[in-house]
Amino acid sequence: PGFSFSTLNQWVHVAVVTNENGVDGEVRDGIPVMTKIYVNGQLMLSERGRDDRLPYTPNDKEVAMVAFTGLSATANRIGEKSTNGCMRHLHIWKSAKTQAEIQHLMDTPESVTGSESDLVCGWTLNKTVSDNNNIKDLTGKFSARLIGDFQWVENR
């Protein structure tokens, strides 16, 4: 992703914040900083948008949300690219979180209940579920399924 870090046998909190108008309103050389990546609450990367970019247009296509694999622009898996790892919490928010908010969520992930007005969806993945094809999120609006090789690791 443009930076490297060693995390073998360590839990790492990763947060990606995007806003086409500029995360925190930040603009660099007249171009909005559209993406910031935080690792363990510290800013690791900030990227400007392209100056010739088109405005974001939402669509109603059902595009799979994936973790630990690469996707092409058409939402197809890229070969056999994948990463081994564990995931404990996954949250998608409507609002672009500040660094302080990211650090708070990193320190208290259990504080996310599903009733937050700007939470789109979220999963707490610290215990096995009864159906790997229908894992309900915290909001009760969405479900996920596990595809490929996986194993549940409880309370890690």
Give the role of each language-model region.
Residues P1-F5, R77-I78, M106-G114:
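Short surface loop/edge beta-strand patches of beta-sandwich-type extracellular domains
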Residues P1-L54, F150-R156:
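Extracellular glycan-interaction surfaces
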Residues Q10, I31-V33, E62, T83-R88, ...:
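Residues that flank catalytic or metal-binding motifs in active/ligand-binding sites
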Residues V14, M87-I92:
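Extracellular beta-strand elements of beta-rich domains used
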Residues E20-V23, Q42, L71-T74, I92-A100, ...:
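Acidic glycine-/aspartate-rich tracts in secreted/extracellular proteins
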Residues M44-C86, G114-V120:
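Flexible glycan-contacting loops in extracellular carbohydrate-active proteins
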Residues Q103-R156:
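Extracytoplasmic low-complexity segments
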